[in-house]
Regions:
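An N-terminal, well-structured beta->alpha segment
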Residues: 1-5
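ATP/NTP-dependent adenylation/nucleotidyl-transfer catalytic domains that generate, transfer
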Residues: 6-26, 41-51, 58-61, 70-116, ...
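Conserved G/P- and acidic residue-centered "switch" motifs that form tight phosphate/ATP-binding loops
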Residues: 33
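N-terminal Rossmann-fold NAD(P) dinucleotide-binding loop
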Residues: 36
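Conserved SAM-binding loop
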Residues: 67
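His/acidic metal-ligating clusters that form di-metal
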Residues: 120
């Protein structure tokens, strides 16, 4: 992979898109994870205005520390970068109390609240984006966005542009190393940070990113039954998740009215 060439390509693509959209730059949500670290660094290299937002909601201290350290590093390196921490915990707590229901009656309550966290962050990003004339830069990678749908509809999936959505997680790590993203972020176990209890991406999806990348490469030309053991299991997981996520990537269905009814 031509890492430097890919970096230059994405940075130029970002600059061109912002110019066409007549935007001043980008706002990026920074979580302390690898994807947001890479996207924010790429945005910083455009020399356009960049606002980094850290938006903790009952967040673990290690995630907060990584996010704040990363924002500090970028501010030191790039004069076009500004950073802000917006604690969304009080707003989320108020929302959760207002809509509280019995978990016994509604077993999907915790999942609904996890997605609500993501949507609250999306609302915040667009609020600050509109204040400053900035585009919301998404941080989803190829596996998450087009493979297994590991994102929240109208949450972290609600963005203006997706700079790294054509890169697998492994490729994102390669860019991170080239961009000199901190070792703490590069070594951190991937997690979406949407739960009160620690849940890694692998635990939630049932497979690691390298495993899912393999499954994505053989999906369509092979079936789970073509393999044995763990490979069969992983491809079955990928197939199930990929089919279930189609509503996230397909256009919103529109009820077409027959011509004769007009």
């Amino acid at each position: 992979m031509q890492t430097q060439a890919i970096i230059r390509h994405i940075v130029q693509w970002l600059k061109d898109y912002a110019e066409q959209a007549r935007a001043k730059g980008f706002v990026v949500g920074v979580s302390g994870g690898i994807d947001s670290a890479v996207v924010s660094t790429l945005a910083a290299q455009t020399d356009l205005s960049v606002l980094l937002l850290e938006m903790p909601i009952r967040q673990k201290s290690d995630q907060v520390n990584r996010a704040q350290e990363h924002m500090g590093r970028l501010k030191q390196r790039y004069p076009n970068v500004k950073a802000q921490s917006v604690d969304l915990t009080p707003a989320f707590d108020t929302f959760a109390d207002t809509v509280d229901v019995s978990e016994t009656e509604f077993p999907n309550k915790q999942l609904a609240l996890a997605n609500a966290r993501s949507r609250l962050r999306m609302t915040t990003l667009y609020y600050y984006g509109q204040l400053h004339g900035l585009l919301v830069a998404g941080t989803g990678n190829k596996i998450e966005d087009f493979g297994v749908g590991f994102f929240t509809k109208y949450g972290d999936g609600g963005v203006d542009i997706s700079p790294i959505a054509d890169l697998t997680k492994t490729q994102v790590y390669a860019l991170a190393a080239e961009l000199d993203v901190s070792e703490d972020i590069q070594k951190a176990v991937p997690t979406d940070g949407l739960w009160d209890t620690e849940r890694t991406d692998e635990e939630q999806m049932g497979a690691s990113y390298p495993e899912l990348e393999w499954a994505m490469s053989v999906y369509g030309s092979h079936k789970p039954e073509d393999f044995e053991g763990r490979q069969r299991e992983v491809l079955a997981i990928y197939t199930r998740l990929h089919k279930a996520m189609q509503h996230k990537v397909n256009p919103i269905p529109v009820c077409k009215i027959p011509e004769e009814l007009f």
